[in-house]
């Protein structure tokens, strides 16, 4: 298992406007993580205990629409 920012296939993390911890916790659990929250500094969902195969944010740029 690993911790990190879950992403779609385009290396774009999930934004949590309004610092919605419940949204991020559900999103993370739907991805089989243990839990999650909205990291306010980046306004992005952060997950704890994601499966190793689940993609997480890398240093590359977000490329919307590229799967």
Swiss-Prot record:
It comes from the Eukaryota. Expressed by the venom gland. Disulfide bonds join 12-62, 16-38, 24-45, 28-47. The modification Proline amide is found at residue 64. One of its GO terms (molecular function) is toxin activity. Residues 2-63 form the LCN-type CS-alpha/beta domain. InterPro entries: LCN-type_CS_alpha_beta_dom, Scorpion_toxin-like, Scorpion_toxin-like_sf, Scorpion_toxinL, Scorpion_toxinL/defensin. Pfam families: Toxin_3. GO terms for biological process: defense response. One of its GO terms (cellular component) is extracellular region. Keywords: Amidation, Disulfide bond, Ion channel impairing toxin, Neurotoxin, Secreted, Toxin, Voltage-gated sodium channel impairing toxin. It is found in: Secreted. Belongs to the long (4 C-C) scorpion toxin superfamily. Sodium channel inhibitor family. Alpha subfamily. Alpha toxins bind voltage-independently at site-3 of sodium channels (Nav) and inhibit the inactivation of the activated channels, thereby blocking neuronal transmission. Has the structural arrangement of an alpha-helix connected to antiparallel beta-sheets by disulfide bonds (CS-alpha/beta). This is Alpha-toxin Tf3. It comes from Tityus fasciolatus (Central Brazilian scorpion).
């Amino acid at each position: 298992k690993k911790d990190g920012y879950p992403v779609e296939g385009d290396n774009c993390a999930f934004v949590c406007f309004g610092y919605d911890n419940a949204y991020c916790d559900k999103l993370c659990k739907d991805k089989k993580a243990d839990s999650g929250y909205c990291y306010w500094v980046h306004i992005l969902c952060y997950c704890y205990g994601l499966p190793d195969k689940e993609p997480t944010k890398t240093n590359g740029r977000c490329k919307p629409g590229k799967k």
